[in-house]
Amino acid sequence: LPDVPPVYGITRPVQTWNPIKINFQHLWLLIQDAYRTNSWKDKFRIWFMPTGWRPADVIERYPVYKIDDPYHFQKYAPEASVALRTWTWIQFLFTFALINYFFINIANIGTPNIFVYGGFLFLCVFAYTELMDKNPYAWAWEALKNAIGLFLIYQNGWFGMSETMPWGTVALASYFVLSSIVVALFARSLTFYS
């Protein structure tokens, strides 16, 4: 139909910026539906049915919000101040720099440490997207991320960074401290969220 504009997206909006939560929300719904349905047949076949299929008895008892009209719906766009948006971009760029360092030095970092580094990157993304969602516990995720980052630096430097960039470890440690302070300020002041 040439006169109907295409609409791209999903019919069950996730209402978060957090990609880790997004990946597990659908799995969690499948697990809950498999547990909640009374039909043993549905408990098994839910894992093999097309995307979006739910057992009939579960749909009635546990409805899930679904977009019925793709041309008129509320998009997920939480209000954020200029300060919060600016800090989010700084967090993103810093995480992007850490990812680039990881890929450039993956051979030097070594097998057990690449998993530590990868897990830390997941925590970085989780922490700043929780702040974007204005989760009241975003400060705790940020504090955990920064504490682990400082611990890793204290243990052995930042995965060989001091060999190529002598100032890099100090800059990274400073970022972790500054990040904790800034996110604590966001968490304490509601004016940052308006």
Outline where the language-model segments fall.
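Cytosolic/stromal cytosol-facing helical appendages immediately following the last transmembrane segment
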Residues: 1-88, 126, 132, 137, ...
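Substrate-recognition/cap regions that form aromatic- and gly/pro-loop-enriched pockets
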Residues: 75-163, 167-193
